[in-house]
């Protein structure tokens, strides 16, 4: 029997409203490690523009991005029975993302987040509704699953997913822990960590998972591998990214920006999309590292997490034009 989907993404979906601020300030301490966005209190604050983007979120962005790269994708998520939920379904239809695992929750609104853009960075106001989801058992057999952000109410779903993975040993798993999943940590999500084929985190998230102050990349890789993931990708913002398959560590520089980034929302998801899609296509780890930053570069040139996502011909064309220095380096 021919497999219907190459990859099924699992996680919350939202509408993002991007508000571009002009009259704000940023206050930082400890060498710009901790920064605060400041607005005038009890005042009318002007903004430059508003852009509304439906069907976004870590898993949604990956499902859309992988579909643009030519893979057959679907998403298991939940929405409200309202106008915004219908917008999300239409966006998935347009992007050729399978919708049969989208649970419509009557009586609840669709997740709606506000993204405050100032310069090239963003601060996001979030709220996850307490949705009911279709159980993972509904997925039957999937060759790849990508699992990411869900709200605090969804702990039971994590246990259901662990049960599904026990019954489907051949299913490969991409895991990018969201805010609540980082809070739960490997102690409560140990079975998911142990079944993870490829894990995506940034350097700070890796430190948080391991409860360490060390930022040494090899120390972080060793600690995360002990939790179970076979391949790990650690992003480090504009500095580049790292990856490990337990046998070898690599550093990958960023793809050169054609112009200064416009807005960074979705850069990490675009990286995960390029990386994971290459693996689903059967490409080696070193090639996955080349695919990932190209997608991130394209996304930060646009507002929102999806507008800049590349098609496969576009990505391969950019790779052919890449400088000779754009390749993984063993570390």
Where do the model's predicted regions map?
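Glycine-rich phosphate/adenosyl-contacting loop at the front of the ribokinase-like
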Residues: 1-74, 86
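Ribokinase/PfkB-type carbohydrate-kinase core domain
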Residues: 1-29, 51, 89-104, 116-255, ...
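Short pre-catalytic strand/loop immediately N-terminal to key active-site residues, enriched for Gly-Thr
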Residues: 45-54, 253-266, 286
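Short, small-residue alpha-helix embedded
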Residues: 71, 207-208, 261-285, 289, ...
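Short alpha-helical functional segments enriched in proximate histidine and acidic residues
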Residues: 95, 278, 295, 299
């Amino acid at each position: 029997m021919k497999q219907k989907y190459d990859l099924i993404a699992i996680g919350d979906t939202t509408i993002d409203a991007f508000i571009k601020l002009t009259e704000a300030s940023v206050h930082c301490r400890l060498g710009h490690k901790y920064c605060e966005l400041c607005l005038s209190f009890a005042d009318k604050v002007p903004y430059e523009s508003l852009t509304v983007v439906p069907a976004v979120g870590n898993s949604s962005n990956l499902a859309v991005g992988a579909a643009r790269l030519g893979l057959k994708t679907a998403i298991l998520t939940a929405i409200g029975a309202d106008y915004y939920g219908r917008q999300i379904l239409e966006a998935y239809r347009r992007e050729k993302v399978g919708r049969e695992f989208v649970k419509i929750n009557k009586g609840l609104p669709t997740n709606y987040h506000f993204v405050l853009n100032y310069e090239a960075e963003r601060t996001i106001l979030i709220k996850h509704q307490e949705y009911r989801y279709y159980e993972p058992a509904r997925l039957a057999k999937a060759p790849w699953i990508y699992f990411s952000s869900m709200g605090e109410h969804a702990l039971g779903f994590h246990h259901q997913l662990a049960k599904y993975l026990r019954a489907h040993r051949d299913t490969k798993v991409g895991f990018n822990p969201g805010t609540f999943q980082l809070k739960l940590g490997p102690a409560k999500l140990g079975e998911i960590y142990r079944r993870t084929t490829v894990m995506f985190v940034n350097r700070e998230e890796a430190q948080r998972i391991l409860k360490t102050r060390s930022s040494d990349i090899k120390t972080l890789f060793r600690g995360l591998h002990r939790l179970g993931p076979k391949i790990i990708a650690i992003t480090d913002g504009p500095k580049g990214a790292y990856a490990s398959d337990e046998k070898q560590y690599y550093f990958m520089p960023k793809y050169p920006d054609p112009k200064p980034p416009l807005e960074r929302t979705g850069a990490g998801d675009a990286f995960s999309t390029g990386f994971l899609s290459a693996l689903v296509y059967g490409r080696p780890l070193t090639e996955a590292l080349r695919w990932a930053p190209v997608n991130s570069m394209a996304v930060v040139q646009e507002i929102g997490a999806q507008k800049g996502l590349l098609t496969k011909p576009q990505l391969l064309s950019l790779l052919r034009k890449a400088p000779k220095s754009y390749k993984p380096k063993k570390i």
